[in-house]
């Protein structure tokens, strides 16, 4: 897999396992030549965002004491059948496990902070590798079993956590939208009367893929005080309430899918593109000039790379396009006067001079970024169809990806939505692309089950195979 290179050939993707039957894209961080750089740029965007909200990054170990997982299993929810145990040559050593989530581990850390006299609220993030053994079937998130990147945030506080919930759910949707990844924020429905063993409420950011299925990008769990009570996270005798946020490589992989709507020419948003400007010499003799231009762009903070493959112009253009660069700078040969063309593909665009390359590239990248975001949001909205009632099997061919159906909060109506088996229940939509819906402004429509007027709705669609 790590030797595979995207060449615009969908069959090659299948053979290299970058695309698989289990999930649209897998193994992106090991995909040559730039998968790791793409993942890192996405992580940096979320790191900066959480830092702006007062979150501090911790370097948590990937190994956690097995005792912490056992305490969680005894009073909250057990993951003991899904963890990897790490063995030591010393039989007397404390048994440890590979971390699968942050909650038990960070609860112990926060309890220690409180004993040392630190005061809440606590807001932290961490990025690391996690692992999980899914013995009952491979879940899309865990195709590699050991997952990197895994980004988590945890907030612990006394009192109302609605502002932190909105920050984790809706504001992060704005981060995703700004890199060309459209989202809908939803709250997961659960069977009326069912107690949440792990969390009081679960929120998600989902995206509707171009092929017509939905996939979950981020999750926000309202954990209540269950972890604080189990691990002794108390301030002045009061257990702290907790929120957990997380996303994995799945978010990056969904970003790849949206970027590859044209498999011959993927395009990444300038903010996260490993190569913002691909510099392509039309003839091999222009490689030196191309290198000087790329260096000038780099000096102005624009990520540029020269594609000077000696096998010929076609090889150069194919490799340049494979990097998903949003902008191309073509260095024409002597027969065309050595002109420079700046455009959205090789050999296209307006003629510019060497002295204006950096300024014009910066202007074009800003415009292209706005255009990509707008197109992604518009296309995403077209995948949602509004309906008055639950769909019938005969309606499926007319549903682009999902349907939004009015649904009130009555227990019988929630059960009716969960019981229908035509489409998967994605959740109750609460916002999109970083903006929360104004519940009071939503027009009342007859509930699909009881017909009472309601401003609430439910999103139904086809979840990607294996997703719960």
Labelled PLM ranges:
Residues 316-335:
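A short, hydrophobic beta-strand-centered structural micro-motif
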